[in-house]
Amino acid sequence: MAKFTQHTGLVVPLDAANVDTDAIIPKQFLQKVTRTGFGQHLFHDWRFLDDAGQQPNPEFVLNKPHYKGASILLARENFGCGSSREHAPWALTDYGFSVVIAPSFADIFYGNSFNNQLLPVKLSDEEVDELFKLVDEQEGITFTVDLENQVVQADSKRYPFEIDSFRRHCMINGLDSIGLTLQHEASITEYEKNQPAFLN
């Protein structure tokens, strides 16, 4: 995985609570097991007026011209709730998002996000309210999310956030479960050499 230390990007506000995984990526688009190609179906039922995805909904925030290219999603509480599907962070990252900021996340979605190099940032309800107001007042505003120092820089204000130290380490160093295992490759090889022949 790519290393994540700091990200600066355009912010798009999704002012809705309890956004579930079926809204993020509807079930009819889950046939693939690769991580790419899901971005075109992100928030399909909200982004489009037709089932074929040919008629964009002009009222949906992601379809607003000034949010084109957004890479930071600002959301409300309990983001990513509903059924467990890793396709949800796949769709978000494939669309171009690197960070989701919200007061809270569903547990499974939260874990899946780290596994797919999507940074979920938890801030308080009051802080998220401030950020929504800021985005509304300053069209096209960008935030800087500094994972190393655990802070969101928005305009002139800094918002510290907490994150598990192990997950932070993995994202900063671009480590998934395979990468973590390979860090101990020499020890694993040495261990295998010392096992009885009938175990090999």
Swiss-Prot record:
Superkingdom field: Bacteria
Sequence intervals crossing the membrane: none
EC number(s) recorded for this UniProt protein: 4.2.1.33
One CC-aspect GO term: 3-isopropylmalate dehydratase complex
Protein's pathway: Amino-acid biosynthesis; L-leucine biosynthesis; L-leucine from 3-methyl-2-oxobutanoate: step 2/4
InterPro entries: 3-IsopropMal_deHydase_ssu, Aconitase/3IPM_dehydase_swvl, AconitaseA/IPMdHydase_ssu_swvl, IPMI_Swivel, LeuD
One term of GO molecular function: 3-isopropylmalate dehydratase activity
Catalytic activity field: (2R,3S)-3-isopropylmalate = (2S)-2-isopropylmalate
Pfam families according to UniProt: Aconitase_C
Quaternary structure note: Heterodimer of LeuC and LeuD.
Family under the similarity heading: Belongs to the LeuD family. LeuD type 1 subfamily.
Protein's name in the database: 3-isopropylmalate dehydratase small subunit
